[in-house]
Curated annotation (Swiss-Prot):
Residues 34-83 form a coiled coil. The lineage of its organism: Eukaryota, Amoebozoa, Evosea, Eumycetozoa, Dictyostelia. InterPro entries: AAA+_ATPase, ABC2_TM, ABC_transporter-like_ATP-bd, ABC_transporter-like_CS, ABCG_transporters, P-loop_NTPase. This is ABC transporter G family member 4. One of its GO terms (molecular function) is ATPase-coupled transmembrane transporter activity. It comes from Dictyostelium discoideum (Social amoeba). The gene is abcG4. Residues 12-29 have a biased composition (Basic and acidic residues). Signal peptide: none annotated. The chain crosses the membrane at residues 540-560, 579-599, 628-648, 656-676, 687-707, 713-733, 771-791. The keyword Membrane applies. Residues 211-464 form the ABC transporter domain. Residues 540-793 form the ABC transmembrane type-2 domain.
């Protein structure tokens, strides 16, 4: 038993030793962990201390920078007082809380504006704070503008854009000689009120008792008679603003606010209404020379689809830069294409859908917009106006186009003004200045519109995740619906414009170099060359005319090919007369296939005429020459096929005279269709007009009803029917002194010769030369009418 107990005791001792060893190891491991934690804590403390030191250093640097900025601001404010507001005896203003020299009264501008505004608004205490905070914001805007001008004068431009803008640390040289400052003062625009005359007529009828009240009850809501309607509608009223050189300005406002109207007036593109006010370039009125400084890019891209990018710009360069050589024009065009990012698309076609339905592959929508910008930049303008440059483009192409415009302001010093509606935030922050037009009045112009709106009302703060453009339009809507707020906003801007902005108008000298106008002959040559290129490249339309001419010739030849094979008798003579009638009728209807072409070309012409690239007359002559030449080949094919198959009077003289008659008829029809398309302006109206005219022409052409059989009441109509003169000329050529074969008795011989048939048709006293002469007069008439329609009707009205 003792042995067993001793053994157990030994076992217990062994276990206790093992436990002691384990405890010792645990203690060591814990000690190691504690040491590691201590080391890591020490390292963290050291890092925190280093971070604190860095933060302190950054704070010190920021404080130093703020102090420097405050000093610079104070210096600038002193400069503003001395430069913009010179000392005057008893009337002098200061910016915000800045005072003048001790010798003069210290009048605060914000206090001056507040006192003026208190006469207009009973709630002056609240509005005064808003106005004063708005003035403070405007001071910041002037400081920013002054800083940008200082940076420009040093020949460098530092583009550091935040809040969605691109970062660009490159220093770019600016050509300040290109840019100009544009100021517009008290711009007013009025148009005639159509309802004024309507109301006047109704009131006159009511006074005379010729109309009852019950008859006009349906019109009372649309045309009130209880108040006098103004004779003119005011679209813009006393709009003033300033655009500095090298700025990219956004002209914003709700739909119908007048922003597009203001843009058209600034771009000298308004063709209707009454415009008053002044537009100054570097503080000077320069009259017609203003056109030399600006270019305009329309919302729609209208180009010739078959032209290349280079040819499109070359066309503008040839007509706008007459003093340049071809080599200089080539260099200018390639530089412009490089500026707009199209240097790799030099020989690419514009592309689009041709009038015949053929699709020409070409540029994308954004690239076409850049071509429009390139055409405007060919003349190296100082001002570039764009109407909705992002309209119809996706977000990516819109951003690309706007970045191109931004680069132009930096690289070339070009001043860019765009009318925009709701740009995306990335585009909004690209603009250096924002102008807001509301109900035909200017309510803001500056670089910090969001701060300005918040200064007007504390509720006008843009949420961080909201598009600033959407926010601005929402605020504009609220201001419009609040008459007192709208009146206060407009008055505040007008007072600020008068006292703060207007004195900063530049007086820099202007070097006006008005280029010579291109001569008519050169304009004709350039337009004719482009028309020829388009004609050659659009082969579908021309070949379709050729195919139709061949089919008409073969079809008529198949139907009348056996006539007169054994000699022409009186029955076959009537068939040949029917052949002549159908040929002339076909030649009258064949130009209808080109109506869509004529209308589409008219759209291009209107766009180019609005830009005053060329005079309409040389353009018209150049484009009509192509129609004259192509028409001859169509008539030549039809006449030759019929003369070779149908047994007509064969002689070279008869063939040539017949060809002339058919060609004159076809040419008159072509010019008639062109005249109708120029007057109507649309494909549908042109078809309607031409169809009505053709029915009358065919009916009185002299075949269906001989002119001797027409009643006296409307028998004169054949005298104004050019188809009649064509039909009479061809009948005289074929039948005069031509012997017919008489039938065997008892069938009477009605026409023993062609003279009898000519007499039956009432053409006894007609001569070939007389018919051709009158036909020539009709061709000249339609030619002149086509030009008048091009020149006077369906102009681009803006």
């Amino acid at each position: 038993m003792e042995d067993i107990g001793n053994n157990n005791f030994e076992i217990i001792d062994d276990k206790s030793d093992e436990k002691n060893d384990e405890n010792f190891e645990d203690k060591n491991s814990r000690n190691n962990i504690n040491e590691e934690q201590i080391l890591s804590n020490q390292q963290q403390q050291q890092q925190q201390q280093q971070q604190q030191q860095q933060q302190q250093q950054q704070q010190q640097q920021q404080q130093q920078q703020q102090q420097q900025q405050q000093q610079e601001q104070q210096q600038f404010k002193n400069e503003v007082i001395n430069t913009l507001h010179p000392k005057q005896p008893n009337n002098e203003y200061s910016l915000s809380s800045l005072s003048l020299s001790p010798q003069t009264p210290q009048i605060n501008l914000s206090e001056k504006l507040i006192s003026d505004n208190s006469n207009l608004n009973s709630n002056s205490n609240n509005n005064n704070k808003d106005i004063e905070s708005g003035i403070q914001t405007k001071i910041k805007n002037i400081e920013n503008r002054r800083n940008s001008i200082n940076s420009d004068s040093s020949g460098t431009f530092n583009n550091e854009i935040t809040n969605g803008r691109s970062n660009d640390n490159e220093i770019i040289n600016i050509n300040n000689n290109v840019g100009v400052q544009v100021t517009f003062e008290n711009i007013c625009y009025k148009v005639l009120n159509k309802k004024y005359n309507e109301q006047k007529k109704i009131i006159k009828k009511l006074e005379s008792g010729k109309i009852d009240i019950e008859d006009i009850e349906s019109q009372v809501n649309k045309l009130p008679i209880d108040r006098i309607i103004e004779k003119e509608l005011t679209i813009l009223s006393n709009v003033s603003g300033i655009v500095e050189k090298g700025e990219m300005v956004a002209l914003m406002g709700p739909s119908g606010s007048g922003k597009s109207t203001l843009l058209d007036i600034l771009a000298n593109r308004k063709s209707t209404g009454t415009i008053t006010g002044k537009i100054l370039v570097n503080g000077k009125e320069i009259g017609e020379a203003y056109k030399m400084f600006c270019s305009y890019v329309t919302q729609e891209e209208v180009f010739l689809e078959t032209s290349t990018v280079y040819e499109t710009l070359k066309f503008h360069a040839d007509l706008r830069l007459p003093d340049m050589t071809d080599t200089e024009k080539d260099i200018r065009i390639k530089q412009v294409l490089k500026d707009v990012g199209l240097d790799r698309k030099l020989n690419s076609k514009i592309g689009g859908i041709l009038p015949g339905g053929m699709i020409v592959k070409g540029l994308s929508g954004g690239e076409k917009k850049r071509v429009s910008i390139g055409c405007a930049l060919v003349t190296n303008p100082s001002l570039l106006f764009l109407d909705e440059p992002t309209s119809g483009l996706d977000s990516l192409n819109s951003l690309k186009v706007m970045k191109v415009l931004l680069e132009l302001t930096k690289m070339k010093g070009v001043t860019v003004v765009c009318s925009v509606h709701q740009p995306r935030p990335e585009i909004f922050y690209l603009f250096s200045n924002i102008m807001v037009v509301l109900k035909g009045r200017m309510v803001y112009s500056g670089s910090n519109i969001l701060e300005y709106l918040s200064s007007i009302d504390s509720n006008y703060k843009c949420p961080p995740q909201m598009n600033p453009a959407d926010f601005i339009l929402d605020v504009c809507d609220e201001i419009v619906n609040n008459p007192s707020q709208y009146s206060t906003t407009v008055d505040t801007w007008e007072k600020y414009w008068k006292h703060e902005i207007q004195p900063t108008i530049s007086n820099d000298p202007i070097n006006i170099d008005i280029p010579k106008r291109v001569g008519f002959i050169y304009q004709y040559w350039v337009c004719q060359k482009r028309s020829y290129q388009s004609f050659v490249r659009n082969r579908v339309v021309f070949f379709s005319k050729i195919v139709i001419a061949i089919l008409i010739g073969l079809l008529f030849s198949a139907c009348f090919g056996t006539v007169g094979y054994d000699g022409l008798d009186q029955n076959e003579a009537q068939s040949v007369s029917a052949l002549f009638f159908f040929i002339i009728t076909s030649l009258n209807l064949l130009p209808y296939s080109s109506i869509s072409t004529f209308v589409s070309i008219r759209t291009l012409f209107n766009s180019e005429r609005a830009s005053k690239i060329y005079h309409p007359f040389p353009y018209f002559i150049g484009s009509m020459l192509i129609e004259i030449v192509s028409s001859f080949f169509v008539v030549l094919i039809i006449t030759t096929i019929i003369y070779c198959i149908v047994h007509l009077r064969w002689s070279f003289e008869a063939y040539i005279l017949s060809l002339i008659s058919f060609y004159m008829v076809f040419l008159a029809s072509v010019f008639m269709v062109i005249a109708m398309s120029n007057i109507a302006g649309t494909v549908d109206l042109t078809f309607s007009y031409c169809t009505g005219v053709s029915v009358v022409l065919v009916l009185f052409s002299g075949f269906l009803v001989p002119i001797n059989s027409l009643p006296d009441s409307f028998g004169w109509i054949h005298h104004i029917d050019y188809l009649f003169y064509g039909f009479s000329s061809i009948v005289i050529i074929q039948y005069r002194d031509f012997e017919f074969q008489c039938p065997q008795p008892p069938i009477p011989c009605l026409y023993s010769n062609g003279n009898n048939l000519i007499e039956f048709l009432g053409l006894k006293n007609w001569e070939y030369n007389k018919s051709i002469g009158i036909l020539t007069i009709w061709i000249a008439f339609f030619y002149i009418l086509a030009y008048i329609g091009l020149y006077k009707f369906n102009k681009e009205k803006r």
